[in-house]
């Protein structure tokens, strides 16, 4: 394509500087260094690295990256060669191979365009859609949309609801036990007063013993509250700190994942554009001027992928630790709860068993339960008050009649 031109096409570097260098890589057992190559004759004036594969000599060395231009292999220039020819040159070398390159000094912020931001929004929307809805709207779903970590996030939300329910139930239970302990304390005070005022020594001792039993139960209840209360603190720590921190980490991971998917989609679109122009036989400006825009997106995609991999690793580790803590913590808390409740009920049973003082014999007044013929019926204070009021009314009526005199046959009053 460029052979017909009488001049060289100037590269459009988009203001991105390059730094020359070289690196010697030791090939692996498959005679590979772990890079894929793009560009080259006849459509692009330069060859560049499209991708550096994981766990390969090039990736482990870390010198070259996606978007870097390859200028030579073992001191031999590759200008004007195709990517297939350059790949064969690298394969022909056994053992170590020296790659000459121009390092692309790209700033990832340059690749974060409005198009990438819109693609991130699209991926975020598609993430929460079903496959049928996405297909109906004509939205493509990336392969990482059905991410297992998203399901782990849903499980985390269910765990948070479980802990929230346990916390509320424990609070209500502790409140009920506190009120119950106050009731036992009131019982103890009442029976203690009765025992102190009881003149019969045996009955007094029985009432005091029964009062002490209720006061002991109140102490057992307070001890139960002090033992179970730290359980609320541990549950709240897990619910209000560990789970929100993990949830925030997963949200950061999703943001990085959507950014990586956006760059992948952008690379796919640019590849399709390039293939379409090649099929039509029309030169593409960015390709014929060094394809720097494409190489910038390749670099951004590689760095986004590195962040995505690291973030995914961190999230998986944090989720694993959180799951282990959940299993261990829930078992420990339930064991502490059950053992504390068991001890409380056993202690209460032992105290009440020792305080078996019934029936209690008490001395009542001799007239209280006397039903003989010489004894009148039992009257309480209200009946006595009513009798006194009736007697007073009769006295007043008698005095009134004596003062006014008798009545005549017609019922009218007459003077005496």
From Swiss-Prot:
Q: Which GO terms describe its cellular component?
A: cytoplasm; cytoskeleton; dendrite; dendritic spine; glutamatergic synapse; Golgi apparatus; mitochondrion; neuron projection
InterPro entries per record:
AH/BAR_dom_sf, AH_dom, Arfaptin_fam, PDZ, PDZ_sf, PICK1_BAR
Entry-linked PROSITE patterns: AH, PDZ
PDZ domain segment(s)? 22-105
Q: List residues, modification Phosphothreonine.
A: 82
Q: What does this protein do?
A: Probable adapter protein that bind to and organize the subcellular localization of a variety of membrane proteins containing some PDZ recognition sequence. Involved in the clustering of various receptors, possibly by acting at the receptor internalization level. Plays a role in synaptic plasticity by regulating the trafficking and internalization of AMPA receptors. May be regulated upon PRKCA activation. May regulate ASIC1/ASIC3 channel.
| Protein's UniProt name | PRKCA-binding protein
